[in-house]
Amino acid sequence: MPGPTVVRFTARVVGRVQGVGFRDYVRTRGRRLGLVGTATNMPDGAVVVIAEGGAPACQNLARLLVTGHTPGWTDRVEVVWQRAQGDLADFRRK
């Protein structure tokens, strides 16, 4: 039986998400879900999350970003779904 479909998403998270432990939260949750990716602070105060792995796990992480049960708060989350690229090896905070 084949495993879950592997997907990738990029999420731009806007709100109070820098300096509050948000990237560490995303990295920890992503690793627990078996995902690889990055959580990167942007100059405008947003955080960009790139995650890749099984579709159900990616959907779970994307849902966590939107619900607001994260350090700080989110005003807006823009998620773009893509094909997996296979270029990530771990979940890192940048």
From Swiss-Prot:
Belongs to the acylphosphatase family. The lineage of its organism: Bacteria, Bacillati, Actinomycetota, Actinomycetes, Frankiales. This is Acylphosphatase. It holds the Pfam family Acylphosphatase. PROSITE patterns: ACYLPHOSPHATASE_1 (PS00150), ACYLPHOSPHATASE_3 (PS51160). Keywords: Hydrolase. GO terms for molecular function: acylphosphatase activity. It catalyses: an acyl phosphate + H2O = a carboxylate + phosphate + H(+). The gene is acyP. The active site is at residues 23, 41.
